[in-house]
Amino acid sequence: MKCKLIFAVFMLAFSMPSQAERIKDIANVQGVRNNQLIGYGLVVGLPGTGEKTNYTEQTFTTMLKNFGINLPENFRPKIKNVAVVAVHADMPAFIKPGQELDVTVSSLGEAKSLRGGTLLQTFLKGVDGNVYAIAQGSLVVSGFSADGLDGSKVIQNTPTVGRIPNGAIVERSVATPFSTGDYLTFNLRRSDFSTAQRMADAINDLLGPDMARPLDATSIQVSAPRDVSQRVSFLATLENIEVEPAEESAKVIVNSRTGTIVVGQNVKLLPAAVTHGGLTVTIAEATQVSQPNALANGQTTVTSNSTINATESDRRMFMFNPGTTLDELVRAVNLVGAAPSDVLAILEALKVAGALHGELIII
């Protein structure tokens, strides 16, 4: 049976000229970035959907000790409305103490659901071990789970992960190099020597010669005023300068799991003839039991009968002329009813043969 080829082909910027983009859309200012925060805490108030693990009990007991409540030795509290969780948040650059962050709360243990729970005060630390924010509040959980008495279970979305909008208060800000030094450095989101040079030229055309210089395919260094109050307006001017990015290199990206093929600009094929045969081998096992007569002095035996069938589908050969695009290749392969795996095999073979001009990336 022929397998219909199911995949998407996107031609990126076929013959369309590159459009100018603002610097803020293609580059970041070095040092101006988010910082990841993480913490370990307790969610309480769960309607019997919590967990009973050793580390949950230990964390709960430690919390009580911090409030001056000491439990007897070897006493194990029976709790089902508590869960230990990991709390994380992204701290934007320039955020100040007193401002709020959204936090995500994820169960670390066997809790069935965090719906209805409240996160108790949790310290959020940076990679340096310092506390930068404190999180607390009621969780918003979109998922839910329900268990039946017969063991059946219904789960929608993810009930063990929730969010607390504005659930953390910033206690300490993070220093950035924005206000120090004589230079500002921009880093391109997609490294390209041509784009880096064009960006430096565009800045120099506006501000004057030698104000900007490309350091490599990613970084462009710009002379900046030392006065911090002038840097904001200076950067506001820079980030709105329009630059025409260079054309992307020829690439073909194939997702081997979904069959999606993305074809970039300038991908070409040299003359080539392609044929791809499909050999299918089917092995069927049939187990038979031989049972002797009750009065006979024999033994029950089990035998296996194997049936092996091999079929090879008829595949056509197709030839490509100079300058053939991958779009035309995909259409030709579609006509012969190839599967996504067949297309991937053909692309790999063309690349090895040197007939595919472009980088083949398989994800």
From Swiss-Prot:
Protein name: Flagellar P-ring protein
Cellular component GO terms, alphabetical: bacterial-type flagellum basal body, distal rod, P ring; outer membrane-bounded periplasmic space
Subunit (UniProt): The basal body constitutes a major portion of the flagellar organelle and consists of four rings (L,P,S, and M) mounted on a central rod.
Family of this protein: Belongs to the FlgI family.
Free-text function comment from the UniProt entry: Assembles around the rod to form the L-ring and probably protects the motor/basal body from shearing forces during rotation.
UniProt-listed GO biological process terms: bacterial-type flagellum-dependent cell motility
NCBIfam families per record: PRK05303.1
GO MF term (any one): structural molecule activity
Subcellular location per the Swiss-Prot or TrEMBL entry: Periplasm; Bacterial flagellum basal body
Domain of life of the organism encoding this protein: Bacteria
Oxidoreductase listed as a keyword: no
Native source species: Shewanella oneidensis (strain ATCC 700550 / JCM 31522 / CIP 106686 / LMG 19005 / NCIMB 14063 / MR-1)
UniProt keyword terms in alphabetical order: Bacterial flagellum, Periplasm, Signal
Signal peptide positions (record): 1-20
UniProt keyword annotation of Signal present: yes
